[in-house]
From Swiss-Prot:
Lineage: Bacteria, Bacillati, Bacillota, Bacilli, Lactobacillales
Any one of the GO BP annotations: translation
Name of the encoding gene: gatB
HAMAP family referenced in this protein's UniProt entry, alphabetically: GatB
Family membership: Belongs to the GatB/GatE family. GatB subfamily.
Protein name: Aspartyl/glutamyl-tRNA(Asn/Gln) amidotransferase subunit B
UniProt KW Glycoprotein keyword: no
GO molecular function list: asparaginyl-tRNA synthase (glutamine-hydrolyzing) activity; ATP binding; glutaminyl-tRNA synthase (glutamine-hydrolyzing) activity
Record flagged with keyword Cell cycle: no
Source organism of the structure: Lactococcus lactis subsp. cremoris (strain SK11)
């Protein structure tokens, strides 16, 4: 029997606010254990949560980016469960009135297949702390993460392959990233994903029994976990067995999912309205204010790059892969620089440097101003492309002006024939055999002489001018 795969994803996104959702403690990643905490995070008796308005702002922006309806009157709920990293013994979340509902997002697979994935809801909640089990037999609780604001985005079970799930995550990350409400970095925990997977015979409308898969810390691991889980369930069903509703953990070393616990239902959490957080009324004016603050989406930017700037689809996708690079590009072309040249540098030398240094664009000295200044120096013949690579490294490491560095370092390209001719004659004198070979009909000998000329000028000779002069002198020598 053949089965159809049914996948739904629950994605937690950490919001980039300066303080937590209900306390003034910092949300900064890292730091010593329990250093970014407040009495509210510790749940000391008598303390009350105070809502961070910036979290509501971020929730509205996310809902708009995901084409969702917005609950204009909403409240928070208590989700009750006991665990050491949850000192209140309940989590403040949203149950029946999430901030966003009834949304959708477009996905595209590598083969060009497109689909619309519906999004059931997006609700705001606080994160829990973190447990660490030491080798000394003790367990330790770090509450730095306790109270960090999250938005949980729950898709409908519209995905039919692990590849579609991967494409959905890619599109979702891009949409959230361009709102500016989160950096969506899975490696730092600011984006986490749980998957619900079930199988059903083709043609059957009812869903099969689902399992939830956790502990997937990258998009590729999500795909690997889904591949394994689909195969595991299919094997059980074909053998006449039954699937249990359970929660499983992905082991990235073995590529397998492992049983964690029998799945709880929503009733186990005993949701009820949070009495200490008031109901919020979201006006149309508030929503429009957030809509107007949203930057151009990645999709709109790609269309602009292709239709208005003449870039290829590949270039447009590379530039919009991260908002930081796209923003940098948009600023750079304001200086009347050829968009294609800026694109080439960002995808070439800049990307290679960032990868090798394991840094992001804002962490180096390169700016839209000094990059475009350097490109102009290449275009007007002041420096060669080879010298430009040296200039770029200087700008990346230390910032500053490209033009000032070129002058200070003596890197200005030699284009004056009166300066080049004596050097050419000196090269001929030191390489008489190559000159004789060229005059004897060996054309490649001239290339060797050009190489010697560039070496003699430490790469500063204008290649076009130097090569033209050298051939003229060879023919007249």
């Amino acid at each position: 029997m053949n089965f159809e795969t049914v996948i739904g994803l629950e994605v937690h996104v950490e919001l980039s606010t300066n303080s937590k959702i209900f306390s003034p403690a910092s949300t900064k990643f890292g730091g010593d254990p329990n250093s970014n905490t407040n009495v509210i995070d510790w749940s000391l008796p008598g303390v009350l949560p105070v809502m961070n308005k910036g979290v509501i702002d971020s929730g509205i922006k996310a809902a708009l980016a995901l084409n969702m309806d917005i609950h204009k009157s909403m409240h928070f709920d208590r989700k009750n469960y006991f665990y050491p990293d949850n000192p209140k013994a309940y989590q403040i979340s949203q149950f029946d009135e999430p901030i966003g509902y009834n949304g959708s997002i477009e996905i595209e697979l590598e083969d060009g297949h497109k689909a619309t994935i519906r999004i059931e809801r997006a609700h705001l909640e606080e994160d829990a702390g973190k447990n660490t089990h030491g080798t000394d037999g003790y367990s330790y609780v770090d509450l730095n993460r306790q109270g960090v604001p999250l938005i949980e985005i729950v898709s409908e079970a519209d995905m039919r392959t692990p590849e579609e799930a991967y494409a959905y995550l890619t599109a979702l990350k891009e949409a959230i990233l361009y709102t500016g409400i989160s950096d969506v970095k899975m490696e730092e925990g600011s984006m986490r994903c749980d998957a619900n997977v079930s199988l059903r015979p083709y043609g059957q409308e009812a869903f099969g029994v689902k399992t939830e898969v956790k502990n997937m810390n990258s998009f590729s691991n999500v795909k690997k976990a889904l591949d394994f889980e689909v195969a595991r369930q299919a094997k059980i069903l074909r053998a006449g067995g039954e699937i249990r509703q359970e929660t499983r953990r992905f082991n990235d070393k073995t590529g397998e999912t492992i049983l964690m616990r029998v799945k709880e239902g929503a009733s186990d959490y005993r949701y009820f309205p949070e009495p200490d957080v008031p109901r919020f009324e979201i006006s149309d004016e508030w929503i429009e204010q957030m809509r107007e603050s949203l930057p151009m989406t990645a999709t709109a930017r790609r269309a602009h790059y292709i239709n208005d700037l003449g870039l290829s689809d590949y270039d447009a996708r590379q530039l919009t892969a991260t908002k930081e690079v796209s923003d940098f590009f948009d600023q750079a072309i304001k200086f009347d620089t050829d968009p294609k040249l800026v694109s080439n540098w960002l995808q070439g030398e800049v990307a290679q440097y960032l990868n090798s240094e394991k840094k992001e664009l804002h962490e180096i000295g390169l700016t839209p101003e000094n990059l475009t200044e350097m490109i102009r120096l290449i275009s007007d013949g002041t420096i060669s492309s080879k010298i430009a690579k040296k200039v770029f490294i200087e700008l990346a490491k230390n910032g500053g002006s490209a033009e000032e560095f070129v002058k200070k370092a003596g890197l200005v390209q030699i284009s004056d024939p009166d300066l080049l001719l004596p050097i050419i004659h000196e090269v001929f004198a030191k390489n008489e055999q190559s000159v004789a070979d060229y005059r004897g009909g060996k054309q490649n000998a001239a290339k060797a002489l050009v190489g010697q000329l560039m070496k003699a000028t430490k790469g500063q000779a204008n290649p076009t001018v130097a090569q033209k002069l050298l051939y003229q002198e060879l023919d007249n020598f």
